[in-house]
Amino acid sequence: MTIILGADAHGNDLKEAIKGFLQQEGFDVTDVTAIADDFVDNTLAVARALKADEESLGIMIDAYGAGPFMVATKIKGMVAAEVSDERSAYMTRGHNNARMITMGAEIVGQELAKNIAKGFVTGHYDGGRHQIRVDMLNKMA
């Protein structure tokens, strides 16, 4: 599994901290950040990479996390969540089969962001009764 990271200028420092942490934890990390680009373009770059590799997961960081979340959820078949705590990151994998999370560098600090990233990438989709909702989400966009 590859973890695809992206950030705009506001999220780049936090992204770098998460990147180093995930690499230290043994994860394969690909950074698609184009620092001069807006969060919209960087979110689309993460989403394109996720679409190209169905086994990958993505994390996109800007100042507040809301903008990238809105962009990601406009993409057909992309289930994403804006998170600011570890439990939500873990549960969105387990119950929603989210492939991307978004975070805000103005909302979470480095240690919390690392824990959020770890919760997300170590979570596993539970399937079963949750698949009904995932199917509903995939039909919507």
Curated annotation (Swiss-Prot):
It comes from Streptococcus equi subsp. equi (strain 4047). It catalyses: aldehydo-D-galactose 6-phosphate = keto-D-tagatose 6-phosphate. It is an enzyme of class 5 (isomerase). GO terms for biological process: D-allose catabolic process; galactose catabolic process; lactose catabolic process via tagatose-6-phosphate; pentose-phosphate shunt, non-oxidative branch. Transmembrane segments: none annotated. This is Galactose-6-phosphate isomerase subunit LacA. Belongs to the LacAB/RpiB family. GO terms for molecular function: galactose-6-phosphate isomerase activity; ribose-5-phosphate isomerase activity. Pathway: Carbohydrate metabolism; D-galactose 6-phosphate degradation; D-tagatose 6-phosphate from D-galactose 6-phosphate: step 1/1. It comes from the Bacteria. Its EC number is 5.3.1.26. InterPro entries: LacA, RpiB_LacA_LacB, RpiB_LacA_LacB_sf. Keywords: Isomerase, Lactose metabolism. The lineage of its organism: Bacteria, Bacillati, Bacillota, Bacilli, Lactobacillales. Heteromultimeric protein consisting of LacA and LacB.
